[in-house]
Amino acid sequence: MAKRVADAQIQRETYDSNESDDDVTPSTKVASSAVMNRRKIAMPKRRMAFKPFGSAKSDETKQASSFSFLNRADGTGEAQVDNSPTTESNSRLKALNLQFKAKVDDLVLGKPLADLRPLFTRYELYIKNILEAPVKSIENPTQTKGNDAKPAKVEDVQKSSDSSSEDEVKVEGPKFTIDAKPPISDSVFSFGPKKENRKKDESDSENDIEIKGPEFKFSGTVSSDVFKLNPSTDKNEKKTETNAKPFSFSSATSTTEQTKSKNPLSLTEATKTNVDNNSKAEASFTFGTKHAADSQNNKPSFVFGQAAAKPSLEKSSFTFGSTTIEKKNDENSTSNSKPEKSSDSNDSNPSFSFSIPSKNTPDASKPSFSFGVPNSSKNETSKPVFSFGAATPSAKEASQEDDNNNVEKPSSKPAFNLISNAGTEKEKESKKDSKPAFSFGISNGSESKDSDKPSLPSAVDGENDKKEATKPAFSFGINTNTTKTADTKAPTFTFGSSALADNKEDVKKPFSFGTSQPNNTPSFSFGKTTANLPANSSTSPAPSIPSTGFKFSLPFEQKGSQTTTNDSKEESTTEATGNESQDATKVDATPEESKPINLQNGEEDEVALFSQKAKLMTFNAETKSYDSRGVGEMKLLKKKDDPSKVRLLCRSDGMGNVLLNATVVDSFKYEPLAPGNDNLIKAPTVAADGKLVTYIVKFKQKEEGRSFTKAIEDAKKEMK
């Protein structure tokens, strides 16, 4: 753009001063309007110089020419001709700009901080009016030279090259046009209405060659539906299903036309009728009320509703409710030594019974574990192994109702009895009870002669059985029976005080844990034993010397119980030695019992300044780790009379072994192992061989470690 402007200026100046190289061509040729519309050419503004009577060297000519400074320097001063047209819009625009400049200068000088936006809005309005006005061109008059030759007129069809011409220029882009249509007569893809099939002429022209692409056809109808959403309306057909539905959610009213196989699971009330009972298969699981007519059919394994049918022959292993099954043949159970069994006498009670059974069948076996109060009947019953409730037996068994026939029906007692036996006298006389191996309650059977023998069977109708009964192996209760028995065995282990003072023959007990008063001294005595010898003790054999074992209370009867080889001397001195042993017991027992045990740990004359549980560790140079010495109570002890003597003492938990016993040295530093580890305290000590050993005392909390170091520092201050 700048080059074109420069060339135009040079041509114009050379033309005015006759410096053109080609004199034949008087002026430049203006391009056509079509060419000028396609390109933008900036032209300088021109002034109209009109001096019909003046010379070309006048000052007006110089002022009128915008390029008067380009005159030749030789001073010829020939007049220049300005042939550029001056339009009315240019004059208006110039006047507008001069007024706008003056207004802006006045406003800025008066008010430097003024807002110029209103001026620009008005300027924009005025300039739009000027640019929209029609352009009128005015031709400048031509000036003649010295000769009479008239130069050719230059057609000025150019528009103003001002910025106003920018709106009139239309820039059009390239256009793409297709001269001929494609040779394809029938296209593959059609976007308009369907074309009619034209008959093709038989020719060899290449333009008529039809190019066909792939075709996709979806014609045809689906013969069979994969998914049928509409239900079938054919209600006349009757289809018989051979397989039963696994689940039934509604009440089924089966008929002869339907299948005979029933649903395995029935979730509602089954009201099926008109079905053959022999081919009827009951449901495995029944969740509703079932009205079964045939009692011989199989019952459901699990019944969650109330069954209105008759009870089955098999009873459940677990019973959670009271059973109210009646006997069928009641009349056969009386006036017989061995009653006949009823129709359901073979029924077995559940293994676990959690309620009071009211079944009166003759041969009902009791549950192994009984958690309730059993109502025993007349029939023969077996007691449970473990009895946790008070036994309230009824009257005699059915076999003992007849006075003439005395038949014994043994019933086993529970092996473990955790409550007191409150049985009636009739039951004890009528039954042979095996006493429990372990007795945890107080036996109150004082009326019978052999009631203190837990395992001795009782006699029926006053008959005394001579068989020997054994005591329980372990007796944890107090036996209050004071009657005399012929054959009595003392329990192996006795944990309570025994009051069997009138027994004729006493057996030495190996272990005695309570206060007992037998004549013999036990091997292991854990309590005070006092021998009560009867008046006719001369007839009883002399007590033997007990074996030496673990004696926590010395049996003092051994001083007067030594025997001699002479039998006559033993009989004469038995009573004297017995009296002397009792006196020696009273005299020697007083100082032995009153003497306290003096336990000293060496801390009696010291004051504990600090005491806290801690873990003691030492550093192992080989493994580069800390080895634990033990866990115990870390104490800081100070002498009461000498504050300068302070030591560290740590005993292990349990055995009380000394883990650390070292004197606190004033020059040693007892500080944390690291600045952040206040619970790990270094405790330097001097070993027996003179070496320095540093222990690490590990506390659970950091506050405990701070208290430990503070207690040591306070003790050091008192040492000085």
Curated annotation (Swiss-Prot):
Residues 583-720 form the RanBD1 domain. Component of the nuclear pore complex (NPC). NPC constitutes the exclusive means of nucleocytoplasmic transport. NPCs allow the passive diffusion of ions and small molecules and the active, nuclear transport receptor-mediated bidirectional transport of macromolecules such as proteins, RNAs, ribonucleoparticles (RNPs), and ribosomal subunits across the nuclear envelope. Due to its 8-fold rotational symmetry, all subunits are present with 8 copies or multiples thereof. Binds to the nuclear basket of the NPC through NUP60 in a (GSP1, GSP2) GTPase-GTP-dependent manner. Residues 81-92, 243-278, 315-324, 373-384, 513-533, 574-584 have a biased composition (Polar residues). Its main location: nucleus. Residues 147-159, 193-202, 424-435 have a biased composition (Basic and acidic residues). GO terms for biological process: mRNA export from nucleus in response to heat stress; NLS-bearing protein import into nucleus; nucleocytoplasmic transport; poly(A)+ mRNA export from nucleus; post-transcriptional tethering of RNA polymerase II gene DNA at nuclear periphery; protein export from nucleus; protein localization to nuclear inner membrane; silent mating-type cassette heterochromatin formation. Present with 2960 molecules/cell in log phase SD medium. Residues 35-50 are annotated as: Interaction with SRP1 NLS binding site 1. This is Nucleoporin NUP2. GO terms for molecular function: importin-alpha family protein binding; small GTPase binding; structural constituent of nuclear pore. Residues 345-360, 479-495, 534-548 have a biased composition (Low complexity). It is a peripheral membrane protein. The modification Phosphothreonine is found at T361, T590. PANTHER family: NUCLEAR PORE COMPLEX PROTEIN SIMILAR TO S. CEREVISIAE NUP2 (EUROFUNG) (PTHR38697:SF1). Functions as a component of the nuclear pore complex (NPC). NPC components, collectively referred to as nucleoporins (NUPs), can play the role of both NPC structural components and of docking or interaction partners for transiently associated nuclear transport factors. Active directional transport is assured by both, a Phe-Gly (FG) repeat affinity gradient for these transport factors across the NPC and a transport cofactor concentration gradient across the nuclear envelope (GSP1 and GSP2 GTPases associated predominantly with GTP in the nucleus, with GDP in the cytoplasm). FXFG repeats lie at residues 189-192, 285-288, 302-305, 318-321, 369-372, 386-389, 438-441, 474-477, 493-496, 511-514, 524-527. It is found in: Nucleus, Nuclear pore complex; Nucleus membrane. The modification Phosphoserine is found at S17, S20, S137, S165, S203, S205, S348, S351, S581. FXF repeats lie at residues 67-69, 216-218, 247-249, 352-354, 550-552.
